[in-house]
């Protein structure tokens, strides 16, 4: 089967979606299928990669986001016709929803992957009141379900906004690359810092409003107020970087530039004693899973999908600096916290995730052939 994947919200410095696309593509190819991918790029380019052929299409930058959008339906349709896939897998329910109808006219299967929570985005990032925001999200989701043969979500949280409309959404958790994200030290002997040793904290998540990164800064402020010797390292970038640097003035917070080498990133994150993952709208939270795989216990918020991922590998807390600071202190006291974090991460593999995706594609193909 030739599976064409399409994603708009991917950039050289984006995170979870780009990682998922690469991992699924590699596993599809290893299973004997053919995988192709269309993503935005600065110019027209075709490269052969481990995940299959990657087509980069000129796109229009979205100011202040770091992303670009492929807008040309005519150009995209012509490219997709030239690629001639047996199935499509689209990671964007808004700007590329028309692709489901494109696939249906050609008699091939279509899967839409919902990497974001439309309801949460409408409520938190627009001036629309709660009830109209829910109605708007429901409309978008019903249209998506109508246009595609299957809807896939990475978590129960992401699937809920479909289920409440009677839409059958498959839940396919993501995975982690254990060859890269593996503990750098013996977890059985890893103890909390002794008195006089600085507690190292790492922030998980892009620096954008929907990730609520300010909560991590305020958690450090609360820990300092309690007299703890802590230092938090923030990896990554985003539109809130300047604001967060200003907020963190006079606090022990280090902002690290974007690290492209995944092994280096893993080594640096794996040196932390505790991680903080504050994103309330995460539909999975791949960065949190990767830090768990390194054996770093994690405090996450009790909203969104992070609690489904972190589970016994950390602490689930309300989104307040006090509650998160309590969570950090609890993990520093918890016996075997680092072993439990790694054990939790081992529930999530890319092999299982990709196999479930292939089962969905193959089920659609059997249905179309019947």
Set out the residue ranges of the language-model regions:
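Conserved acidic donor-binding segment of nucleotide-sugar-dependent glycosyltransferases
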Residues: 255, 311-322, 329-335
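Nucleotide-activated donor-binding/catalytic signature segment of Leloir-type glycosyltransferases, i.e.
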Residues: 242-263
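Aromatic "clamp/platform" in nucleotide-sugar-dependent glycosyltransferases that forms part
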Residues: 280
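Carbohydrate-associated surface elements
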Residues: 157, 175
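Conserved donor-binding/catalytic core segment of Leloir-type glycosyltransferases
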Residues: 4, 192-221
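Short hydrophobic beta-strand element within catalytic cores of glycosyltransferases
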Residues: 293, 297-300
